Design a protein with these regions (language model features):
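Short beta-strand-loop-alpha-helix junction that forms the active-site gateway
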Residues: 162, 168-169
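Accessory nucleic acid-recognition modules appended to NTPase machines
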Residues: 1-163
Length: 169
């Protein structure tokens, strides 16, 4: 029903690509992704080439349509020290975990990703603006050199001018 509404309202011509985009997003909740990765995965899985290739623009448009239909929400990554947002990759969370599970046939029950999605939804229900935090740290490599590594803060919840940093695992 929800896909039919999107197809009618947005005049979607390629239902197969919309469904594949939905399936890939359902399978990757809580993982960093972007339209380019989704398009590459679709083209590779379906062995598409030439004019049949799914473009990044098409995937971006379809991801936007899924978000407009309240099926997914994009959560941006935020550089805590640099105080700016990254363009890509971001995370996408299902607005309804039950729909996500039904869509992918109740397989892929990665509890950490599902729990992350549930926590994200709870924070949003409580009225928080939510970002994924990124902090850079210096660590020693195996060769003994200092290297910069990005560390993730699961959530930065902003509510009423107050920031709360949440690391659940």
């Amino acid at each position: 029903v929800y896909l039919k509404d999107i197809v009618e309202r947005k005049k979607i011509k390629r239902l197969d690509i919309l469904e594949a985009t939905l399936d890939l997003l359902c399978s990757s909740v809580g993982s960093l992704t972007n339209p380019n990765n989704v398009a590459k995965a679709m083209n590779s899985k379906q062995k598409l080439s030439g004019e049949d290739l799914v473009s990044n623009n098409t995937v971006t448009s379809y991801m936007d349509h899924l978000a407009d239909a309240y099926l997914f929400e994009e959560c941006k990554r935020y550089d805590v020290k640099g105080k700016n947002y990254f363009d890509y990759p971001n995370k996408y969370y299902c607005e309804d975990i039950g729909l996500r599970n039904a869509r992918i046939g109740f397989r892929q029950q990665e509890l950490t990703h599902i729990m992350e999605n549930i926590i994200y939804n709870d924070l949003r229900i409580r009225g928080c603006e939510v970002d994924i935090g990124v902090v850079y740290a210096t660590e020693k490599s195996k060769a003994g050199n200092n290297v910069q590594v990005a560390r993730e803060i699961d959530f930065i919840a902003n509510h009423g001018g107050k920031k709360t940093y949440i690391q659940y695992l």
